A protein has these predicted regions:
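Structured, basic alpha/beta domains of bacterial-type, RNA-associated proteins
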Residues: 1-19, 23-158
């Protein structure tokens, strides 16, 4: 019987599900927003929120817990060139989480992500959704207006 089991299985084995959720959260940390199915977004949301909570702790132990959850255990620095590159990308995700994301959520007590429903996918009618950080603004410029160089060039013709 499956009484009181809250984990969404998503039609996968436990190892496959954990790897998929870790990859989804890594993509969310790297790209600030991820388009996926509604079920996967709902399953990845608590994982992402726990990672930010650990990131706010900013301890060595928290960093190791995040790395253990988000990294593939077989990747090492001593493997092939592809494995070393994958390990460095995973390490970048941990760095981004602890140095950029977690400090921006220092004043917020939970609720770091939002799920925006998109509608159905054309091929199989699966509900799609965007999983993104609450403070993420899609078309925001990277630097404030007026701080850049002048918009007109010296020799421009009219």
């Amino acid at each position: 019987m499956r009484h009181r089991k809250r984990t969404a299985k998503l039609g996968r084995t436990g190892e496959h599900r954990n790897a998929m959720l870790a990859n989804l959260v890594c993509s969310l940390i790297r790209h600030k927003r991820v388009t996926t199915t509604l079920a996967k977004a709902k399953a990845a949301r608590p994982v992402a929120e726990k990672m930010v909570t650990l990131g706010k702790a900013a301890t060595v132990h928290a960093r190791r817990l995040v790395a253990a959850r988000l990294r593939h255990p077989a990747r090492t620095l001593h493997g092939s060139k592809a494995e070393r590159e994958a390990w460095r990308k995973d390490e970048d995700v941990v760095r981004i989480l602890f140095e950029e994301l977690a400090p921006s959520f220092k004043e917020r007590n939970g609720g770091y992500t939002r799920i925006v429903k998109l509608g159905e996918r054309q091929g199989d009618a699966a509900q799609r959704a965007i999983l993104e950080w609450v403070d993420f603004i899609a078309g925001a410029p990277s630097e404030p207006a007026g701080s850049g160089s002048a918009t007109h060039t010296a020799g421009a013709k009219k």
